UniProtKB/Swiss-Prot annotation:
Positions annotated to bind [4Fe-4S] cluster: C67, C71, C74
Family indicated by similarity: Belongs to the radical SAM superfamily. Biotin synthase family.
Free-text comment on the cofactor: Binds 1 [4Fe-4S] cluster. The cluster is coordinated with 3 cysteines and an exchangeable S-adenosyl-L-methionine.
Oligomeric and partner information: Homodimer.
Leader peptide range in chain numbering: none
Keyword Metal-binding: yes
Organismal lineage: Bacteria, Bacillati, Bacillota, Clostridia, Eubacteriales
Matches recorded under Pfam families: BATS, Radical_SAM
BP terms from Gene Ontology: biotin biosynthetic process
Domain Radical SAM core: start-end pairs: 49-278
Superkingdom: Bacteria
Entry GO MF terms: 2 iron, 2 sulfur cluster binding; 4 iron, 4 sulfur cluster binding; biotin synthase activity; iron ion binding
Name of the molecule in the record: Biotin synthase
Length: 334
């Protein structure tokens, strides 16, 4: 298996794409030595295509709870009884304050995240107003995660300074119906295609530990490659009491590392981003940066606590990596 892994690494470094069957063979790694080689090769691929820079992003839970959708993993779904805090859209002042604090800490990206299938009406207009002000007052790169949107809405976001749009596929097409029934996989794909058409970068990934097979993860990795995802957040399920997945079994550390490494093999040039559930990974995912990861959400997540920005910066320095410098383009002033 080690020689096969090295063979694939060599081909990828020559910009030859890995095939689905080859990726599936990598998923069969079980011996400790094979997993170490898989991670080492993924790290080499990361270094070759992406260098030593780590992309840091932060998110703000800008509207929480009462979601109409039935995603089985989600604390914010109105279908389940969880202890999540419910509140309407945050104020412009709150968003500006957090964005400024994060920018001062050296974070590259800042995103508003809202609950619900897709933000609409007056709330969408308010979000646009917030982004206009963020773009005017800050140098941090702006991202958005506002659910299923139309092309025209995405164009308006871009005009307000947003450069990347986040919309997870969550899992493979084949497994999706097991975790959500209130909207289709194709609606998510359509949103991502609209993101691309609008000229925004795509941030899309998924959650592992939903009960999916490794084949589902590999299928997701290839789907994201097809969609040209620039940033691929990988979440580890953090089971929430009151949701259908509250008793989901915990993933092993090796399974998490294997998943991240294979995503790097398939998506050699993307930001492979540690996201929710980092607290379930040893050392808040430190070893993942030796397995192909080169980005992370830092600070708190939507409904759970994350790692402090200062601690992530220390970890990145310890690993002899560098925080990516902000490359925000000349902004249009409003």
């Amino acid at each position: 298996m080690k020689e096969f892994i090295k063979y694939l690494e060599k081909n990828i470094l020559k910009e030859e794409d890995i095939g689905f069957k080859e990726a599936m063979k990598l998923s069969k790694c079980e011996e400790v030595g094979d997993i170490k080689q898989l991670c080492h090769s993924a790290d080499n691929i990361r270094d070759f295509f992406c260098g030593v820079e780590v992309d840091l992003c932060t998110i703000m839970n800008a509207k929480s709870g009462r979601c109409t959708e039935d995603c089985k993993f989600c604390a914010q779904s109105g279908h389940y009884k969880t202890n999540v805090e419910n509140y309407e859209l945050v104020s412009k002042e709150e968003a500006l304050k957090l964005a400024r604090e994060n920018e001062n800490e050296g974070v590259n990206r800042f995103s508003l995240v809202t609950s619900g299938k897709g933000i609409r009406g007056k709330d969408f207009e308010k979000v646009l107003d917030i982004y206009k002000e963020l773009n005017k007052e800050n140098r941090i790169d702006l991202c958005a995660s506002l659910g299923i949107l139309e092309y025209e809405d995405l164009i308006r976001l871009k005009q307000c300074g947003v450069t990347m749009y986040h919309h997870n596929l969550e899992t493979s097409r084949e497994y999706y119906k097991e975790i959500c029934t209130t909207h289709s996989y194709d609606e998510r794909i359509d949103t991502i295609n609209a993101v691309k058409k609008a000229g925004l970068q795509v941030c899309s990934g998924g959650i592992i530990g939903l009960g999916e097979s490794f084949e589902d993860r590999v299928r997701l990795a290839f789907q994201l490659k097809e969609l040209e995802a620039k940033s691929i957040p990988i979440n580890v399920l953090n089971p929430v009491k009151g949701t259908p997945l509250e008793s989901a079994p915990k993933l092993s550390q090796n399974e998490i590392l294997k998943t991240i490494a294979i995503f790097r093999f398939v998506n050699s040039k993307a930001f492979i981003r540690l996201a929710g559930g980092r607290n379930l990974i040893d050392g808040f995912g430190e070893n993942c940066f030796y397995a192909g990861a080169n980005a992370t959400i830092t600070g708190n997540y939507l409904t759970t606590s994350g790692n402090k920005i200062c601690d992530d910066k220390k970890m990145i320095n310890k690993l002899k990596l560098k925080i990516r410098k902000n490359v925000h383009k000349e902004k249009k002033m409003f």
